[in-house]
A protein has these predicted regions:
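Central antiparallel beta-sheet cores of small beta-barrel/beta-sandwich binding domains
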Residues: 1-123
């Protein structure tokens, strides 16, 4: 999910998660800086918490960069009633932020952008 090309163009992308019964999110993702528009994989395992919402909470998250190897961190998901907010944290710093909505009961669609940016990636 890394910003590979730079050049001032803002990174943004999409993740489509399958919601697995054991509290995991299994996602496929791509973004505006992924070479050859490849689809990559991400897995998020939910940490134990007292959230009433089955999606909201903190997750251990890992993905593999096309040219950089594995990346691990924390994914924070917060319920906003009509949608969810997402924050990917790597090495103690926010890497990406996003918003998502449920698609039925077992899927979650999320758009995300570079965590240093302010606001949504829409001009």
């Amino acid at each position: 999910m890394k910003n590979k090309k730079g050049g001032g163009a803002q990174l943004w992308g999409m993740v489509l998660y399958d919601i697995i019964g054991d509290g995991c999110l299994n996602g496929v993702w791509t973004n505006t800086h992924t070479e050859s528009k490849k689809i990559m994989n991400e897995i998020a395992r939910k940490k134990k918490n007292d959230e009433k919402d089955p999606i909201a909470g903190e997750y251990y998250v890992s993905w593999i960069e096309e040219k950089g190897g594995p990346v691990s961190g924390t994914l924070k998901v917060e319920s906003k009633i009509t949608h969810y907010s997402f924050e990917w944290i790597v090495s103690g710093k926010t890497s990406f932020k996003g918003v998502g909505i449920l698609l039925g009961e077992k899927r979650l669609a999320v758009t995300y952008w570079d965590g240093e940016s302010i606001g949504l990636p829409v001009g």
